[in-house]
Amino acid sequence: MIEFPRDFLWGTATSAYQVEGSPLADGAGPSIWQRFSHTPTLVRDGATGDVACDHYRRYLDDVALMRRLGTNAYRFSTSWSRVLPRGRGTINAAGLDFYDRLVDALLANGIEPMVTLYHWDLPAALDDLGGWLNPEIAKWFADYASVMFRKLDDRVKMWATLNEPWVVTDGGYLYGALAPGHRSRFEAPIASHNLLRSHAEAVKAYRAEGRHRIGIVVNLEPKYPASDSPEDRAATQRADAYMNRQYLDPVFLGRYPEELAEIFGEAWPRWPADEVAQIRQPIDFVGVNYYTRNVTRFDRDAWLLQAAAVPQRRATYTETGWEVFAQALTDTLVWVKQRYGNPAIYVTENGAAFFDPPALEGDRLADPLRVDYLRKHITAVHAAIAQGADVRGYFVWSLLDNFEWSLGYSKRFGIVHVDFETQKRTPKDSALFYAKVIASRGGTLTEPA
């Protein structure tokens, strides 16, 4: 029988620009996603986060929904430009008060907040000054973090500095598919380094001002070689260094993986060793976002990594084209334990986009593929705990169907369906399944489907 610890956190996750809506309300400033989504052709169907899930106005209803599901934690991000419209300087009291009210509502309903300080929505005013390419951003970010700590740390016990810095740099500075839309092999390493420096400065600020726990959230995608050939194994190591170790090695070990200099060549800056070592600030946990794995082969013609993904026959794939492979989540959590000294881990995002069929009788929304996905992956988390990984919580991505970045509203990750015309929320079967898992501390995972 599966049984999770009594103090295990069961949560859902969202991010500010994806669910809040009203991005310019009450004195807020524009972010790079406000700018990016309003640029023609960059987001599918011309979608924006102007309304999204209208969480800015409906947050009390959403908190009540979380309570009905039985969750005891909620991970959300704060919008930097809602709090500091120009990214620095004058504080927008109305924006800060929104998060103050949200935290109070969560706690009043027995839900522990986990606050992420940055989930991709950089203030546009700072992007105009170079954004993540400007070394001064580490100070700007630490100052913003301090504003949030002073306002909320008396009630918020878990903070995350950054969400998925790899996506910020890969999508925003290397390939240009995400805001701010740059495409440069030279810019990506600089943005990555400044993100990590900003993380370190925020952790330092927290040690001076905070009283609880702080960490970082990374997306990990384990790489498996397609064969035992030296070429496939080397390609797999390059892909792993680029996506997985590029961020965790500096955070935990104070150094970058050696493969990055090979990958980027002349575009890789030779950072002073003492500067890189400063990224290694003691943190209290690491958040792991996991969605899929990658089977990797050598490809001489593939740009940058000389590596390519190998599609798997007979595998199930999500609507975003990601293979469903739960064993890799166990492997990932155990790998973090072994490589980085068994830190406290939270699975801060895990979920899948599947096509939701029409409602059944009584507004029931059956999403059996998502139910199966959650069953397998939550079971995989338990398997990692059984192997000694210090996993303390699990957050489904996502509570709500929401704005899925450059894909607009075309992909639905929510365990709660959102009608974007009416804003009606309808729990799917996956939400009801998750509620039963929580109530049984995992016991229902082994029941027949």
Please report, for each region that a protein language model flagged, where it lies by residue.
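Catalytic domains of carbohydrate-active enzymes, especially glycoside hydrolases
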Residues: 58-79, 281, 285, 339
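A common structural microfeature
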Residues: 7-9, 56, 73
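Short N-terminal amphipathic alpha-helix/helix-capping patch enriched in small hydrophobics
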Residues: 5, 55, 59-62, 430
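Glycine-rich, proline-tolerant flexible connector loops at the mouths of alpha/beta enzymes
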Residues: 78-91
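Active-site region of glycoside hydrolase catalytic domains
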Residues: 1-43, 67, 86-88, 96-449
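Active-site mouth loops of central-metabolism enzymes
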Residues: 44-58
